[in-house]
A protein has these predicted regions:
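Catalytic cores of the polymerase beta-like nucleotidyltransferase superfamily
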Residues: 1-343
Length: 343
């Protein structure tokens, strides 16, 4: 309805049983609740269901799948009204919660009181706000109040770090990922996920205009933060993201120095392991340019410096390890000194 490209269809089946679908050749794939693959199209078909909260957390629900469950009852358990619009095979829209009206008014609104039962919806609301920001959508006040209540209840702490990262990663792939972090900050969720209550999204906002790689975007968000290690750990980011953000953080600190000398360059090379991780360093260095003022007084060509450093090989005339390392370091220092004097 928003003309946003979609790549799959999910079907809700009313008035049927698991046995009936299996008898028609559908293959069950869902464990928590029955989801089936169509024998030909491989599209997903789920039995209409009702849910009941049984405890705390994202997975503390029991499900009811009998034939009496209506489509409206199934849609009532959805998170937001624009996600609670169904379409039958003839193209007719079923919209019991005025989702089309909210589409027209560009509002992200919860469907019902059942919304508050699932803490994951805090992050989902933030992600939808990021995804739909470019279309002018905003989270309505009542829904924002509800996610603040979920945060205050403490249930957000029951979410696994893996699930938190899954939603965060999806947000990083949207056109306005900074909105995701602004929403979780505003509702108080950020400080429950990690040991900071604020994240500076300005560098992320600057990078997202040209950079679509989620790793680049994440690094722009966190590399300048003094709690980098704790943030990476709290969001359960992949190892590659951790490494790039940590290297970028070191480069940013280096670029903020008023002046640098040869030893500073070698020290940075040592800390970032340029010798074995050349590509990682160069990627992080490019990202760092989004995270530092343009008036940095350093004008170093890191592609040339890295190439220069790594072209220097250990002397074959020396046999003792310590002597080899010392000579290699001296050669690198001399080469960089010569390069700087000629630049």
């Amino acid at each position: 309805l928003l003309k946003i490209p979609f790549y799959e269809k999910d079907w809700v089946v009313v008035g049927a049983t698991k046995e009936e679908l299996i008898g028609k050749g559908y293959k069950q794939i869902g464990k928590e609740f029955p989801v089936f693959l169509h024998p030909e199209t491989k599209e997903e078909y789920a039995l209409a269901r009702k849910e009941r909260k049984t405890g705390t957390g994202h997975k503390a629900f029991s499900f009811e799948f009998d034939k009496s469950v209506s489509l409206e009852e199934d849609l009532e358990r959805r998170d937001i009204t624009i996600n609670a619009i169904a379409q039958d095979k003839k193209g007719n829209l079923i919209d019991p919660f005025k989702g089309q009206e909210d589409l027209k008014n560009k509002i992200i609104r919860r469907v019902s009181d059942a919304f508050k039962e699932d803490p994951l919806r805090v992050l989902r609301i933030a992600r939808f706000a990021a995804k739909l920001n470019g279309h002018g959508f905003k989270v309505d006040e009542d829904t924002m109040e509800e996610i603040q209540k979920i945060v205050s209840s403490g249930e957000l702490t029951t979410l696994s770090r893996e699930r938190i990262w899954m939603e965060t990663y999806k947000a990083l792939t949207t056109d306005n990922p900074e909105v995701y972090f602004q929403v979780i900050e505003e509702c108080g969720a950020l400080s429950q996920i990690c040991p900071v209550s604020q994240l500076d999204t300005s560098f992320l906002a600057k990078a997202m205009k040209t950079q679509t790689d989620p790793n680049v975007r994440w690094t722009c968000l966190v590399a300048s933060n003094s709690s980098l290690e704790d943030i990476n750990n709290s969001f359960n980011v992949p190892k590659e993201y951790v490494e790039i953000s940590e290297v970028c953080s070191l480069i940013i600190a280096f670029k903020k120095l008023d002046s640098v000398n040869v030893k500073d360059i070698i020290e940075l090379a040592d800390k970032t392991d340029i010798y074995r991780k050349e590509e990682r360093f160069l990627k992080a260095e490019k990202i760092s340019n989004f995270c530092i003022d343009n008036n940095s007084n350093q004008n170093l060509n890191w592609n040339e410096i890295v190439k220069l450093i790594n072209n220097i090989k250990a002397s074959s005339d020396l046999k003792e390890g310590k002597l080899i390392a010392k000579k290699l370091r001296e050669d690198r220092l001399n080469a960089i000194q010569l390069y700087l004097s000629e630049s």
